[in-house]
């Protein structure tokens, strides 16, 4: 089983139900048709469990029973495609999810209501990854998570959602669409936290640490003392930078996530990165804490 499939199965197992998640799946994998009775909706996926999930979301929110169909593609290893087909209440569903404009080509981005709400943003990113997301196996040592969109506007909207959670998301246009991607291991782990894939995040971090340990084995024998010295030096440097920010622009002007880390660092200068991570109001990896401390240092350097 690929790591991408593991992540998607964990997300499906969360049992969450969100219209924002459904909106992302419909926008990225849905298509409209016209029949005598009105509009029809077809949502395609190569994952049977995702098809069932879509069926359950439609039933739960709109009390409609869709059809799950499948057909075979030729000359492909993964050649079964599932289609969730619906021919009732389609116009009402599109209107409720604010998708009608997007389907007719007027609006290609993401609903501003989703962009402005944390929980809706998390759910939308979860749906986007379920629909068109993939990531490299951390065993490869090459870290990349990407989500493919048809339109650049939508890819940029996904990047904005990720940046809302301090992820360094970028976009690129390719022949078959636009891609929103993350390349830093810390950002990928934080993304997994954002969408709720905690087990996958823990496995990713464990594999990453194991690889780093193997690669650094020759240096590890004499690293303990040096690491302690570096930790103390880094802690004092960060504290000095936090004081600098407090005396100039003020900590209250930092993003909430950075404010919390800054207060912890100043109040507990002896804390290790792991202790800082454990003390945060929301779970975060050691790498994620380091990522935020680097951002604080960068802000101070620019003052």
Curated annotation (Swiss-Prot):
The lineage of its organism: Bacteria, Bacillati, Bacillota, Bacilli, Lactobacillales. Residues 272-303 bind DNA. Belongs to the WhiA family. NCBIfam families: DNA_bind_WhiA (TIGR00647). It comes from the Bacteria. Involved in cell division and chromosome segregation. One of its GO terms (biological process) is cell division. Keywords: Cell cycle, Cell division, DNA-binding. One of its GO terms (molecular function) is DNA binding. InterPro entries: Homing_endonucl, Sporu_reg_WhiA_N_dom, Sporulation_regulator_WhiA, Sporulation_regulator_WhiA_C, WhiA_LAGLIDADG_dom. It holds the Pfam family LAGLIDADG_WhiA. This is Probable cell division protein WhiA.
């Amino acid at each position: 089983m690929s790591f991408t499939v593991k992540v998607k199965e964990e997300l499906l197992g969360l049992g969450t139900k969100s219209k924002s998640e459904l909106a992302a799946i419909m926008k990225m994998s849905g298509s409209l048709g016209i029949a005598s009775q009105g509009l029809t909706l077809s949502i395609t996926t190569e994952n049977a469990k995702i098809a069932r999930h879509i069926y359950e979301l439609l039933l739960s929110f709109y009390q409609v029973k869709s059809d799950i169909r499948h057909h075979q593609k030729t000359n492909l290893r993964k050649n079964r495609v599932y289609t969730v087909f619906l021919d009732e209440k389609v116009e009402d569903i599109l209107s409720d999810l604010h998708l009608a404009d997007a389907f007719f080509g007027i609006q290609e981005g993401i609903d501003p209501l989703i962009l402005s709400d944390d929980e809706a943003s998390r759910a939308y990113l979860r749906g986007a990854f379920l629909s068109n997301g993939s990531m490299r196996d951390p065993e490869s040592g090459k870290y990349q998570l990407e989500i493919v969109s048809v339109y650049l506007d939508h890819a940029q909207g996904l990047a904005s959602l990720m940046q809302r959670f301090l992820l360094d998301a970028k976009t690129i246009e390719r022949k078959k669409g636009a891609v929103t991607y993350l390349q830093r291991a810390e950002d990928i782990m934080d993304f997994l936290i954002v969408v709720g894939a905690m087990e996958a995040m823990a496995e990713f971090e464990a594999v990453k640490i194991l690889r780093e340990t193997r690669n650094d084995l020759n240096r590890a024998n004499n690293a303990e003392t040096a690491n302690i010295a570096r930790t103390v030096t880094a802690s004092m440097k960060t504290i000095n930078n936090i004081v600098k920010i407090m005396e100039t622009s003020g900590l209250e002007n930092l993003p909430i996530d950075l404010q919390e880390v800054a207060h912890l660092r100043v109040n507990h200068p002896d804390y290790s990165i792991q202790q800082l991570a454990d003390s945060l109001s929301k779970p975060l990896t050691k790498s994620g804490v380091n990522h935020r401390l680097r951002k604080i240092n960068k802000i101070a350097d620019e003052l």
